[in-house]
Amino acid sequence: MVLLAAKGLSLLDVNPGLVVWTLVTFLVVVLVLKKFAWDVILKALDERAETVQNDIKKASELRLEAEALLKDYEARLNSAKDEANAIVAEAKSDALKLKNKLLEETNGEVKAQKDQAVKEIELAKAKALGQLQAQIVEMTITVAAKVLEKQLKSEDYKAFIETELDKLGKLSA
């Protein structure tokens, strides 16, 4: 600008000759481009536009497919969670049933052992009472025989009874 201003030319001045030659040059360039390059340029632009449209379409299809896959994944995940919860609930139920069954079996065994112990105690008690009764009968017979053998005085009789009762107490203890 400084050089043009120094020569006396201004950028804002219109030179009619320069305008004509600029237009002629522009038209020649446009005609040459139209004849040799315009179809190639338009074809490249059309191909690029078509590629962009195809890419947009593919991206849209992929987005829809991804959304469908996401929904399917979420449905499967929820199904798996429900199934896992059902398995856990069933396992808890089975464990509770097994616990109750084992408790019933254990209680049955304990009751059977208790009943067996009670029977054994009753048998031992009956046997001990039978033996005690036999000893009492034997002692009574012995006492009666001794009493009949000799006539005791009442003091001797009391001492004899106390002695025999002491023997009986020692046997039952």
Swiss-Prot record:
Subcellular location: Cell inner membrane
InterPro entries found in the cross-reference section: ATP_synth_b/b'su_bac/chlpt, ATP_synth_F0_bsu_bac, ATP_synthase_B_chain
GO cellular component term, pick one: proton-transporting ATP synthase complex
Gene Ontology terms for molecular function: proton-transporting ATP synthase activity, rotational mechanism; proton-transporting ATPase activity, rotational mechanism
Transmembrane segments: 12-32
PANTHER family the record matches: ATP SYNTHASE SUBUNIT B, ATP SYNTHASE SUBUNIT B', CHLOROPLASTIC
NCBIfam families linked to this entry: ATP_synt_b (TIGR01144), PRK13460.1 (NF009991)
Function per UniProt: F(1)F(0) ATP synthase produces ATP from ADP in the presence of a proton or sodium gradient. F-type ATPases consist of two structural domains, F(1) containing the extramembraneous catalytic core and F(0) containing the membrane proton channel, linked together by a central stalk and a peripheral stalk. During catalysis, ATP synthesis in the catalytic domain of F(1) is coupled via a rotary mechanism of the central stalk subunits to proton translocation. Component of the F(0) channel, it forms part of the peripheral stalk, linking F(1) to F(0).
Binding partners and assembly: F-type ATPases have 2 components, F(1) - the catalytic core - and F(0) - the membrane proton channel. F(1) has five subunits: alpha(3), beta(3), gamma(1), delta(1), epsilon(1). F(0) has three main subunits: a(1), b(2) and c(10-14). The alpha and beta chains form an alternating ring which encloses part of the gamma chain. F(1) is attached to F(0) by a central stalk formed by the gamma and epsilon chains, while a peripheral stalk is formed by the delta and b chains.
Protein name as it appears in the record: ATP synthase subunit b
Organism for this UniProt entry: Leptospira interrogans serogroup Icterohaemorrhagiae serovar copenhageni (strain Fiocruz L1-130)
